[in-house]
Amino acid sequence: EILKIIEKFLKIHIKNQINSGAEIIQIFDSWAGLLDSKDLDKYIYNPTFSLVEFTKTLDVPVICFPRGIKDYKKYCDIIQPDVICIDYEIDPAQIVKDIKIPVQGGMNPQILLTDKENLKKEAKRYLDIFKDHPYIFNLGHGVLPETNPSMMEYLVKIVKDY
């Protein structure tokens, strides 16, 4: 089965990353949210759990980013990552209620295409929601190519000054 072959090579890659100095591993599954619930065990939960379990045997923490997954709580209960990375389609206030492990991300990168006032308001909203929860500030997906670098600099300042 092709998934087993991919999983085998991912474990080799993870081990090589750790041997080269990686102190944490992040597993991205950018297509997790596109699957029907009946396919999640076979294509998401089982292989991802195997990778997380393997990485933890090497004493390295794991961040998982199942973009678009509908039920983050169930995902965390099954996969047991050390940190869960959320996308911008999920309600951060609900995540704080449902998830006890550290959370990373969530803010929509589109906000960086607006103005400083909107950016500050949205960044502070995330910071306020997660103020009593272990949180790594990050976007809910990558920086868009048309983003003005000065807006990224401003965002970093907002977070550092919080």
Go through each PLM region and give its residues.
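Active-site loop segments of alpha/beta catalytic cores
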Residues: 1-162
